[in-house]
């Protein structure tokens, strides 16, 4: 697989710089003969929200745990804040908030005391922020941990990660909130971004990544498929034109710049069009048409193509 190009950093005001907070070079992690991740290269910049998207088992958690030295990598280099992820892991963790996918709670402890205990381990003590976040996420600080629903347990993990994340917040599959709380969570993440914090979040939820992230890295079978600005991917979605002609046509007539693929399917001509739609329509109109249908090629379909191992669009930088 060719090495994916790093997409342009999305600019929103002046909060995103070219300073690399996370830099991963040729990361490989083997579990015996099984590949967790292979030759992974990725940079995450200060002040951006980077989505790390892929199906379950693609290598997202392995990458995150390698970054935080929770597992030993097989090969490669990882630096965070310019520090070695393994040698300087203690210093890195003091500036990093982390929500693991398997976040657990000590039973029968009030949420308030549990959060204060967790934060004391990282040297963070901000009762005011804890109370504010709990109010916004509708988390009862005086409930005991064993009395919490799954969604409220997740809120505890979210609050501790946001409080501990002095400069960097790493989130491993932070899903499970109800829709209203999810939107409030997104607003909080954007506020943290505006303060200059960097957020690296893994997900298998396309809607989540599209809603909150500046860029996205898509991983499949332990290897990166594409790293790109969300807006660029949205622009790539394009159209799918299906045309049934009365007579046989030469497909070379429709090979315009901006036409991604052309194929014939049961007597129909099927074109994926990223730009130059007018030129294609004019060429089509030179023939007798029996039926024609123009559909939008959605972002979801694009991601499914990457997931399924379909041919990668060269214009996307994969």
Language-model-detected regions and their locations in the chain:
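ABC transporter nucleotide-binding domains
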Residues: 19-22, 29-201, 206-220, 226
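ABC transporter nucleotide-binding domain
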Residues: 186-272
């Amino acid at each position: 697989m060719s090495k994916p190009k790093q997409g342009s950093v999305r600019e929103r005001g002046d909060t995103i710089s070219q300073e690399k907070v996370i830099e991963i070079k040729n990361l490989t992690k083997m579990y015996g003969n099984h590949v967790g991740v292979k030759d992974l290269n990725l940079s995450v910049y200060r002040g951006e929200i980077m989505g790390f998207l892929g199906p379950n088992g693609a290598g997202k958690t392995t990458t995150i745990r390698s970054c935080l030295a929770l597992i030993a990598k097989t090969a490669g280099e990882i630096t965070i804040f310019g520090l070695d992820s393994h040698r300087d892991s203690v210093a890195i963790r003091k500036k990093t908030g982390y929500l693991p996918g398997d976040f657990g709670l000590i039973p029968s402890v009030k949420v308030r005391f549990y959060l204060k205990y967790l934060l004391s381990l990282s040297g963070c003590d901000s009762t005011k922020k804890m109370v504010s976040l709990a109010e916004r996420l509708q988390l009862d600080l005086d409930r005991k941990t064993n009395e919490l629903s799954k969604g409220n347990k997740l809120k505890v993990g979210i609050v501790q990660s946001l409080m501990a994340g002095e400069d960097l917040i790493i989130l491993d599959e932070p899903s499970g909130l109800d829709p209203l709380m999810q939107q409030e969570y997104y607003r909080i993440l954007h506020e943290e971004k505006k303060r200059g914090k960097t957020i690296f979040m893994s997900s298998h939820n396309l809607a989540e990544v599209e809603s909150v992230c500046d860029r996205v890295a898509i991983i499949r079978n332990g290897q990166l498929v594409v790293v790109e600005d969300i807006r660029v991917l949205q622009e790539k979605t394009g159209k799918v034109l299906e045309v049934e002609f009365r007579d046989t046509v030469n497909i070379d007539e429709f090979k315009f710049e901006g036409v991604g693929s052309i194929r014939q399917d049961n007597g129909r001509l099927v074109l994926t069009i990223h730009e130059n739609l007018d030129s294609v329509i004019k060429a089509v109109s030179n023939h007798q048409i029996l039926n024609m249908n123009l559909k939008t090629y959605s972002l979801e379909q694009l991601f499914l193509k990457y997931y399924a191992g379909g041919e990668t669009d060269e214009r996307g930088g994969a």
